[in-house]
Design a protein with these regions (language model features):
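C-terminal terminal-subdomain/extension
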Residues: 1-20, 97-148
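Terminal targeting signals and extreme-terminal segments of soluble enzymes
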Residues: 18-30
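Short alpha-helix capping/helix-loop boundary micro-motifs
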Residues: 30-36, 53
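Non-catalytic surface loops within mature trypsin-like serine protease
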Residues: 53, 83, 113-115
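Compact nucleic-acid interaction/catalytic patches
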Residues: 55-62, 67-101
Length: 148
């Protein structure tokens, strides 16, 4: 198992840095549920990566994200998770708890902010989200952006 510091967390910098993507400019997106226990991140899986703060000032945080789509160029689209409560907020989808949070706290997915990830910019230390909860997120992405 690798040990990471704030300086070498996958996705923080360089060509494999995690970046924010404009959901209306990414073109046609086909979300898919295809987790596979193959050591690679796949749509439907929760992985960890460096997520830049929205201020885009170089700061950020290593956090879990849900991979929702694979892009033709080999990158992935994902949405970030938070344990901060967002009940009643349409930009967030409640997905409950899972092994991605060692404290067992409930989580919410932010469908308002789309992240572009690179395979080498992620570390795979979480799990596959079950299809039912993934479909809740997929439905909200479809409503919001027309993604299939």
């Amino acid at each position: 198992m690798s040990t990471y510091t704030d300086e070498n967390v996958p996705g923080r910098s360089g060509p494999t840095a995690t970046t924010e993507a404009d959901p209306r400019a990414v073109g046609k997106v086909r979300t898919e549920y295809s987790p596979a226990h193959d050591g690679d991140p796949d749509p439907g899986e929760i992985v960890w990566t460096w997520v830049p703060y929205e201020e885009n000032d170089g700061r950020g945080k290593d956090r879990p994200v849900l991979v929702v789509a694979r892009e033709p160029g080999g990158t992935f689209l994902a949405v970030q998770l938070s344990s901060k409560r967002h009940d009643g907020d349409r930009e967030w989808v409640a997905i409950g708890s899972g092994p991605w949070d060692k404290s067992g706290r409930d989580s919410w997915v932010d469908v308002d902010r789309i992240l572009r990830l690179h395979q080498r910019g992620m570390r795979r230390e979480a799990c596959a989200l079950d299809r039912g909860r993934f479909n809740l997120v997929r439905k909200r992405l479809h409503e919001r952006y027309g993604w299939t």
